[in-house]
Curated annotation (Swiss-Prot):
GO terms for molecular function: glycine hydroxymethyltransferase activity; pyridoxal phosphate binding. The gene is glyA. Catalyzes the reversible interconversion of serine and glycine with tetrahydrofolate (THF) serving as the one-carbon carrier. This reaction serves as the major source of one-carbon groups required for the biosynthesis of purines, thymidylate, methionine, and other important biomolecules. Also exhibits THF-independent aldolase activity toward beta-hydroxyamino acids, producing glycine and aldehydes, via a retro-aldol mechanism. This is Serine hydroxymethyltransferase. Belongs to the SHMT family. Homodimer.
Amino acid sequence: MENIKKNDIEIHDMLVKELKRQRETIELIASENIASQSVMEAQGSCLTNKYAEGYPGKRYYGGCEVVDIAETIAIERAKKLFNARFANVQPHSGAQANFAILLALLKPGDTIMGLSLSHGGHLTHGSPFNVSGKWFNVISYSVSEKTGCIDYNEIESLVLEHKPKLIISGASAYSRIWDWERISGIAKKVSAYHMSDMAHYAGLVAAGIYPSPVGYADITTTTTHKTLRGPRGGLILTNNEELAKKINSAIFPGEQGGPLMHVIAAKAVAFGEALKPEFKEYQKQVLANAKQLAETLEEGKLKIVSGGTDSHMFLVDLRPLNVKGKNAQDTLEKAGITLNKNGIPYDLEKPTMTSGIRIGSPAVTTRGMKEPEMVKIAEAIIKVLKNIDNEKIISEVSTDMLKLCQEFPIYRGLEY
């Protein structure tokens, strides 16, 4: 980073501060992880200079024979990783991957179904604040108020009543197993498409420890970061050749222009890492760590939505403590723990305040932490939440979390 230090001291100083923050903070945001230096090197490479509109072998620019190699490697690795016949690695994000499916298969005004944002869904699944909710007629399904789990009977009833053209499964804040097969069966009853958004679960799916939607959903979308531990970006998978053609056209020229070849190369690196045996062991630990966090918090009398987790994340209902999600987020950050405020099912609080928090284990697992460290972290969270106005305790926890981070360092040898 000598060139940045020499030519742009403001950005250099920012990078130094952010690296320090990441090194010295317990990261529990479920959608974040710690990418390898190999991934970051590919993303920071000379490929950032190359325009390559189109697809390998069919570009609208010259000089693409080398970057074609990068994209082809990424495609083949993605197909192998998820056992899919077709893969599009060009989406700049998960949101753009999702919108490409809407663009490929639907017309404005068509009916779609997705999990309600307030019950753990995602903005792109039909939220009125998102283009998916502005352009389409949205019917939302929910989780059971009693169990906190998906109500498949409700889904089937709503599908038969409203006959949507697209059913979206997947979530941004749902910790349990998705029954992809059942949703696909329901979709078939009304000849609807089933799109699975496995953005949060992709790494677990790749490792074979969470059910794969690829054999059931017509289309599967995902991000390439989160549990997959790659660069920020999107990916689309399908086993249907006709749908693959429509998806490719929806991405380019329908939604995007030039693909980000440096990011695609970084995706290829991440997919290669995920194909290695140690990635499966990592994901097993991600799951074990999430379960340990949830169990320890529950032992400390915190309420876990749905009673636990089958994945890398879960929600904590803070109402019994009379603590708001935003207050918890802000105070825990002072204590050296970052996570995010999150609405819980049937939450009466505003989205800017919330009654819950979301906790995830991918980043701390990447550090090398295991169950004993999860107990320490969970006990620290309990201590802070039960003493939320006690500056002395917050300071003590911050010191403890810094020591824990130093025991499990990241990016050794990397200096800005």
